[in-house]
Amino acid sequence: MVVKVKQKIPLKIKRMGINGEGIGFYQKTLVFVPGALKGEDIFCQITAVKRNFAEAKLLMVNKASKNRVKPACSVYETCGGCQIMHLAYPKQLDFKDDVIRQALKKFKPTGYEQFEIRPTLGMKKPDHYRAKLQFQLRSFGGTVKAGLFSQGSHRLVPIDNCLVQDQLTQDIINKITQLVDKYKLPIYNERKIAGIRTIMVRKAQASDQVQIIVVSSKEVRLARFIGELTKAFPQVKTVALNSNCSKSSEIYGDETEILWGQEAIHEEVLDYGFALSPRTFYQLNPQQTEVLYGEVVKALDVGSKDHIIDAYCGVGSIGFAFAGKVKSVRGMDIISEAIEDAQKNAKAMGFDNAYYEAGKAEDIIPKWYKQGYRADAIIVDPPRTGLDDKLLKTILHYQPKQMVYVSCNTSTLARDLVQLTKVYDVHYIQSVDMFPHTARTEAVVKLQKRV
């Protein structure tokens, strides 16, 4: 390496990396610079030197890109929650198309150069879209603040006005910090592993109902806190306590108890209503979830004689879009609370052809096949880690005729397509901008078994 830590260098940014950073070459050394844009001439300082590349901090933009904009967020450069707010929104969508291409080029699944990559579907108003927040609580000079850890650190950045957060959820978390201060509730101490560490606030777009989870290392007295909070915000319908005594960075512990209110809030997507209990997963951008699930519906050509497996089904929201038009829908999820919600939701909607079971897809699917169940199509919506190796082998063994892969991580998607394209043809990839101003995107992939 010809560069050293703390060295200041000029740099021409040639392209954007998958995490939104600018990439340039300094005397044949690859340099990653967060905050820099393609085409810019910058001045930066080396912060880390690795075996094959270096990382740098942006000091000055000598020649700015015409696509650079001033972020409206006051904590954008310190928070780390968003990575590309300084890039004009239409160009953010182009960037996300390119991220998919970069991932495919890296992993090279069969036929990737001929894949149809459709333009990313964006939002008309890409602000205040997050219907869920998970903020950490810490004490600053005796005053309680809520926010996010700065990227790569345990330094909390207080946030009282997040540009991408739903305004009601932001107002509620601001009130919560005031009440935690007022009632002297214990704040998390990393050394003692004690106190309130995280607050989750989620709003259902269809009903404006709100649920809250207080994550604490031990039981805390919240009666007066709950009384004043629910009086100030009647939209709050559920307050739950999650016990987490772990030293790890895991947000939640295993036990969640509802302290006040109803068990679930009501949400809707594609004209289907369903219940969400506090610990169940649901997409955090309700507006774009309509778009995303609509693309899943378009991608499957199924009819009244077909059977569908909905892997990683959550509360069943994707499968319900098909339950009224197919012979059966079966789903599974490792979170038992989600399966309980899915079962209740199916019953409430009168879908007696929908069946849900708690457990791992790679264990349950072979069991169903041994019992005689044959899926014509499978939908997978895995976490960022992608498909489990055992599940990949299971899919390739049983080979449903159609498959839709919903991905929230283009790298693991491209990796999994290396295996899937041994049996399936990729008809197209349609990305949906679920997370404006971040480097992340969601993609719907239509696959058909090769004849």
From Swiss-Prot:
Q: Which Gene3D superfamilies match?
A: 2.40.50.1070, Nucleic acid-binding proteins, Vaccinia Virus protein VP39
Q: Which CDD domains match?
A: AdoMet_MTases
Question: Binding of S-adenosyl-L-methionine: at which residues?
Answer: 283, 312, 333, 381
Q: Name one molecular function that GO assigns to this entry.
A: metal ion binding
Provide the top EC class: transferase
Looking at the keywords, is Transport present?
no
Q: What is this protein called?
A: Uncharacterized RNA methyltransferase spyM18_1615
**What species is this protein from?**
Streptococcus pyogenes serotype M18 (strain MGAS8232)
